[in-house]
């Protein structure tokens, strides 16, 4: 009887433990599922600039992405006078918010005086709905504004596995046949020029290339940020057809606003926008990189504060040991500095293009430059959705 009582007692304890652990697991499942759902469905408001003439869907250029998460908004600005066409893309890598927010300032503030402007805020919209697995990234971040605050989705470098899965053991780039990392089949900046019958990410770049061709884009700009341990940083990466323009922009910015270099797109590295867009279309393709300490492997706590201030003592320590390709000090690399670098570089590209091609000018007003963004904060140029005029509010 004593043995039986002991067995019953142990059995009851085991059942209680199973119930407790099962309950805890269910609680974690509900909590994480709720967080994932809120992240994926967080709505981001865009108050359209008075100069936005039209907002199209990317699927108007390729029906193969219609109804998918990557059927993003495309914003069109028509200049008061004719000129060239410039396409600015943010959100290729949504874990690099400086590029996306710089494009946002154009969407909400730009007024084209000469030429046309096309803006995309969420190049890989799928990647805005997930953060890096195991990276402990925040799911969102908030920018203070004159009217309160605006919250944005934090994203990843790759498309959400919920939208594209599984990954191959080795990713074979089309059409070059080059072998790349398996996960890069979900990287928008490794699948250019795309293909109509490919994965979601490949179909997305195919759609963008159709847009570039049909709209006769003259200059394509892809906005990015990079970790300080990455050698391609604080620079303009250019296709060989854009060398003169990129060097002109770099020279003028380095003389008047901030230092920025020039890199040449490698001809034997495929899938990147600065190579494939220039090869497959009439457009000059450029890629801008700004520093983002949040991405460094040697960073400290991965928090919203670190994302927005760019302050990190561990990245600074790496710099003391000569491991960085860009300087960092106690001031870090705040989001205002990173966004300001991009807005000034885009505006300077328009000015330099116009000097080189006076018969096809580009001119824009209303968008703040580097010093203005730092002085006022980028939130000063984000507009209150509740005060938007009828028909001038859209959702990303």
Which ranges hold each PLM region?
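C-terminal accessory segments enriched in acidic
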Residues: 2-76, 109, 200-207, 211-219, ...
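Proline/glycine-enriched tight loop/beta-turn segments at coil->beta junctions
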Residues: 78-85
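Structural motif
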Residues: 85-86, 219
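Active-site histidine-acidic residue metal-binding/catalytic motifs
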Residues: 88-90
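Second-shell loop/turn segments in exported
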Residues: 92-93, 192-198, 332-336
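Di-metal (Zn2+ and/or Mg2+/Mn2+) metal-binding site signature of metallo-dependent hydrolases
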Residues: 92-101
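Active-site/substrate-binding loop(s) of hydrolase catalytic cores
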Residues: 97-98, 113-251
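A short, Lys/Arg-enriched amphipathic alpha-helix followed by its capping loop at the start of a domain
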Residues: 102-115
């Amino acid at each position: 009887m004593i043995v039986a009582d002991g067995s019953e007692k142990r059995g009851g304890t085991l059942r209680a433990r199973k119930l407790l652990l099962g309950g805890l697991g269910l609680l974690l499942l509900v909590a994480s599922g709720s967080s994932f759902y809120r992240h994926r469905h967080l709505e981001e408001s865009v108050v359209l600039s008075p100069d936005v003439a039209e907002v199209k869907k990317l699927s108007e250029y390729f029906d193969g992405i219609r109804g998918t998460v990557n059927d993003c908004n495309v914003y069109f600005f028509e200049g008061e006078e004719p000129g060239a066409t410039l396409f600015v893309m943010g959100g290729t890598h949504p874990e690099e918010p400086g590029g996306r927010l710089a494009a946002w300032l154009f969407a909400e503030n730009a007024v084209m005086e000469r030429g046309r402007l096309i803006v995309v805020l969420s190049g890989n919209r799928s990647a805005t709905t997930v953060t890096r697995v195991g990276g402990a990234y925040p799911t969102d971040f908030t920018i203070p504004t004159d009217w309160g605050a605006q919250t944005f989705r934090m994203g990843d470098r790759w498309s959400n596995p919920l939208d594209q899965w599984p990954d191959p053991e080795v990713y074979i780039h089309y059409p070059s046949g080059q072998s790349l990392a398996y996960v890069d089949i979900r990287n928008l900046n490794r699948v250019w020029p795309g293909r109509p019958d490919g994965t979601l990410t490949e179909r997305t770049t195919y759609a963008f290339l159709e847009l570039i061709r049909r709209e006769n884009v003259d200059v394509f700009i892809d906005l990015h940020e990079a970790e300080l341990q990455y050698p391609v940083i604080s620079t303009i990466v250019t296709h060989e057809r854009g060398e003169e323009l990129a060097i002109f922009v770099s020279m003028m910015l380095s003389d008047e606003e901030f230092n920025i270099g020039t890199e040449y797109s490698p001809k034997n590295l495929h899938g990147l926008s600065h190579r494939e867009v220039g090869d497959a279309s009439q457009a000059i393709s450029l890629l801008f990189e700004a520093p983002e300490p949040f991405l460094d492997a040697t960073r400290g706590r991965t928090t919203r504060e670190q994302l927005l201030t760019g302050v990190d003592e561990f990245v600074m320590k790496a710099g003391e040991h000569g491991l960085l390709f860009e300087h960092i000090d106690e001031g870090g690399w705040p989001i205002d500095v990173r966004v300001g670098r991009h807005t000034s570089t885009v505006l300077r590209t328009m000015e330099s293009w116009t000097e080189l091609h006076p018969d096809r000018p580009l001119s824009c007003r209303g968008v703040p430059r580097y010093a203005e963004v730092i002085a006022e904060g980028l939130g000063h140029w984000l507009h209150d959705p509740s005060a938007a005029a009828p028909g001038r509010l859209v959702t990303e």
